[in-house]
């Protein structure tokens, strides 16, 4: 293919000097599949794997087999490509809503630099084991000769340092008090590892889930000069206990800020609904705290067709909610032609203790209902990623669904969220906790690419969250 289709400088010289005829290269159209496979081989950083949407229409989607598993690859959009083609030294902040390609751009830039500078080391940090697993799998396919690009969570990186530098680390204690022992390892690392300048480039995805102190610690491992620190951020996706809407992150100094607003994930109608949710949420927060100048939720722009309007379905009780879930599954399968693997059922928590002392085990109730209906399902554990071959419907709490996307999401049992209303609007912590639950809503509704069904027993009078959702529909 290269010999017949690529003109290098030597062949160009022969053509100019008329030693070769240009017509031999123009005798027929290029085979687009062969051309795409060639580009995937020589510049894999410009491709995204198993994307549900076909982004760049100038290049066909290609499929290939790796280790007995079939993958698809599509070329990045031209707006994504420009951030991979031009990379500046210094601290770069990429900020954008869910679906704007932050992780895709991050991995593309990381692979690009690692291939350009094979003598230097680079590292990617993510907040979840799930995304870490996915990016490692993508890296194995896209960067086959990799020996200088690592992917870690902060804890896995610290465990690696502990093993290498004989730090005191009791792995069992992490399960008892994660924060305490993570901070202990960070202190040890600072004291023991004097020369921490290990990496030419560091990439922090999901930076909203990292503390400022953790980002500062990570950045200490950069070279002193000619380094690259990329930070990818969306405040609305912060569902950690460290969320503080009253605290600015301006103390993280950046040389360049890039705002991402093109939504590569979702259909137009769904994006418009989410944009209204963003606007209504921002307005509500600012009526309570006008001093909050920056929007927590940012709108995105659609590049796809209309799609389906999201639905909010009101039911009477838990039993009717389960019946509605089963009905929606049947509708999506038989009327919309979706496979079970295209559908996710999302709920806030696996279980919740009620005020009367009883505990509702929602995941157990849901699993039992699916089994009785003979509907195959799988639970969204850390090993389940966007690349994983799925068997059946995915069921997940709000933490398991992060980093996953499906054609259809059935979001139910919103009643489990603790902050349906703000009891005392004078209390900052109550407003902060309410925003934390709004963030959980934002995360769940953004897991869908086309169909969104929200099922609830609450109405506008009993829940400010439901009021915002209904106002957005």
Ranges and model annotations:
Residues 51-76, 95:
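Conserved adenine-nucleotide phosphate-binding loops and their immediately adjacent elements
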Residues 165-221, 394-399:
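Conserved RecA-like ASCE ATPase "motif II neighborhood" in helicase/translocase motors
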Residues 19, 23, 46, 50, ...:
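Short, flexible helical or helix-coil boundary motifs
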Residues 65, 87-89:
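A mid-sequence, solvent-exposed acidic-amphipathic segment
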